[in-house]
Design a protein with these regions (language model features):
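N-terminal signal-anchor transmembrane helix specifying type II single-pass membrane topology
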Residues: 2-85
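Short linear sequence motifs
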Residues: 12, 44, 108, 336, ...
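Broad hydrophobic/π-residue packing in well-ordered secondary structure
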Residues: 35-36, 40, 46-52, 112-115, ...
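Polar/charged alpha-helical tracts
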Residues: 54, 170, 339, 490-493, ...
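Secretory-pathway glycan-assembly enzymes, especially type II membrane glycosyltransferases
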Residues: 59-63, 67-76, 82-412, 417-419, ...
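Catalytic binding pocket for nucleotide-activated donors in carbohydrate/polymer assembly enzymes
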Residues: 417-539
Length: 539
């Protein structure tokens, strides 16, 4: 790395200014191999030691001092290349986030124009209030393509049937009356939030929504309280418009096959590819959710419902931020103290600890679940992976499940659980699906370790946290996990850059305020679709 060249073009060095007037803030320690991501002002080479020391006999005494100091400094840098790269990786990561915020709209007119360009329609009536809230909270303004994708089908249907959105909400409410389906109905009336339902989050959601409910019109919406998505409807299939407008599921949200493998095999769009490109290879046999979902309860009609995760195009749920990703929430996994171990002192291993979740254990199907497979890899490659199941999920042991045998096979002793902060001792952290999404992703990104993530699920932040840029993706069957860890160990600078980028986005972008802005934006779209019913009623 040519760190010296960065110094050479400093105007003060070229002008021969006195040392006391020299500002060393112009000397960032940068890895020029990543200079494409740096500001133009930082893409400058530095003076060599020869340049600094030449003709020192005829120069003022300060040049001799500078020459000596520079030699000592350069020698120190040469002995600590990892520290230098950490500085440049941190800078590049910070700069990428700075650029993200710099390109956001700064006026309502600009934001509205970009919204229209992306969606083909004018912003919803309450968009100005959302914009003011987002600016106050320093949120992203233009980066909500995930929301636009989730709602597009409903806007398409509204062209032909403007009251259909409201009708399906009413239909769901009637169907759910008296059923323990883990679905809550939320009502906003004059800015106050009330909730009816039977989910674990009914005490949390009203507090979250109340942070912005005063800006929303009176409305009702539905939230799925299960980790699993619920709307098993492929709106990308031929004939989807007609099927959506003619619902026929007589028991919505009550389809609960055990196991679920045959149900998904027969559902349109639910044969999930292991990779986005290349020859089609199904992941259905490698996902605990698709094999034997822990708590199924689906509908095969298209209903509007907010959910924490989904698989596209198998499911058509509308994504929103789960409480697991609010730092202020009890549900969020917290570390008791920040990372206090230098990167160089961390082990070149990938770390994971967790429960035996993944799907309902029926016979020996658990061998295909990601968490059990991860422990198998750890046993065969202890030089790369340190993974253990620390707690057995009793509720997922169904008929045909031999609890004692499973615990013995995977040495699940349920002894004292290891502190979450043990992760700090490892350079790499593994994130794998449990019942659905793990809920750990943001915490792992903030931990100081490089995250290797394997999942079949989509979440609301997927457009902001991208594979190969902020984390290292791993196939659902974990067949490339060892290869990816080896790559990280053999390319420490590139791995460190990915780690720093993920850390920076998780800390600065996906914050509680940003989650509120996302949730608020979702409900602004929901309110717009409800407004179509009112407009149709007045015409």
């Amino acid at each position: 790395m040519n760190y010296l060249n960065i110094f050479r073009s400093s105007p003060r060095i070229r002008a021969g200014l006195p040392f006391d007037d020299f500002d060393d803030s112009g000397l960032p320690l940068l890895d020029v191999s990543h200079s494409h991501s740096l500001p133009r002002a930082m893409k400058r080479p530095i003076a060599t030691a020869d340049f600094l020391c030449q003709q020192s006999r005829s120069r003022p005494f300060w040049r001799i001092l500078l020459c000596v100091a520079f030699g000592v400094l350069f020698g120190t840098f040469a002995l600590a290349p990892s520290g230098l790269f950490h500085t440049s990786a941190s800078f590049a990561a910070r700069h990428a986030v700075d650029e993200l915020y710099a390109r956001q709209s700064t006026t309502l007119a600009q934001a509205a124009a970009r919204y229209t360009l992306r969606t083909g329609r004018a912003p919803p009536p309450r968009y100005d209030r959302w914009f003011g809230f987002a600016r106050e909270k320093k949120c992203l303004i233009d980066e909500y393509d995930r929301i636009h994708r989730d709602f597009k089908v409903w806007y398409q249907l509204a062209v032909h049937a403007p009251t259909h959105f409201q009708e399906m909400i009413a239909r769901a409410t009637r169907q759910l009356d008296g059923l323990a389906a883990d679905i809550s109905g939320v009502e906003i009336l004059n800015g106050s939030v009330s909730i009816t339902g039977s989910t674990a989050y009914d005490d949390n959601w009203p507090r979250t929504i109340s942070r912005f409910s005063q800006h929303l019109p009176d409305m009702t919406f539905l939230i799925n309280g299960r980790d699993e998505p619920r709307i098993a409807f492929n709106y990308r299939a031929l004939g989807a418009r007609e099927a959506a407008l003619a619902p026929k599921d007589s028991t919505p949200f009550m389809h609960a096959p055990r196991p679920t493998v045959e149900f998904f095999a027969q559902q349109s769009g639910c044969n999930v590819p292991a990779q986005a490109t290349g020859i089609m290879e199904s992941v259905n046999g490698d996902s605990g959710f698709l094999l034997a979902s822990a708590k199924p309860g689906y509908t095969t009609d298209l209903y509007p419902m907010l959910s924490m995760s989904k698989i596209s195009p198998c499911f058509a749920d509308i994504l929103f931020p789960t409480e697991y990703y609010y730092d202020r929430s009890w549900w969020a996994p917290h570390f008791s103290h920040p990372d206090n171990i230098p990167w160089e002192a961390k082990k070149d291993l990938a770390y994971w600890r967790g429960m035996s979740t993944g799907g309902m254990i029926i016979g020996s199907n658990y061998h295909h679940f990601a968490r059990f497979r991860l422990v198998d890899i750890s046993r065969s490659r202890p030089d790369l992976v340190d993974a253990k199941i620390t707690l057995f999920a009793e509720t997922l042991c169904a008929e045909g499940c031999d609890r004692t045998a499973v615990m013995a096979e995977y040495n699940i002793t349920e002894s004292r659980r290891e502190p979450r902060e043990d992760l700090y001792r490892y350079k790499h952290a593994i994130d794998v699906d449990g019942t659905t999404f793990s809920g750990r992703f943001l915490g792992l990104l903030r931990s100081g370790s490089l995250v290797l993530k394997s999942t079949v699920f989509e979440e609301y932040f997927n457009d902001w946290l991208r594979p190969f840029e902020h984390f290292v993706p791993v196939l659902p069957d974990l067949s490339d996990l060892a290869e990816k860890i080896q790559w990280a160990n053999e390319h420490p600078e590139e791995a460190r850059l990915i780690q720093q980028r993920g850390l920076e986005v998780a800390r600065r972008v996906v914050t509680d305020d940003q989650n509120d802005c996302y949730f608020f934006a979702v409900l602004v779209e929901w309110a717009q679709l409800l407004e179509y019913t009112k407009i149709a009623g007045t015409n």
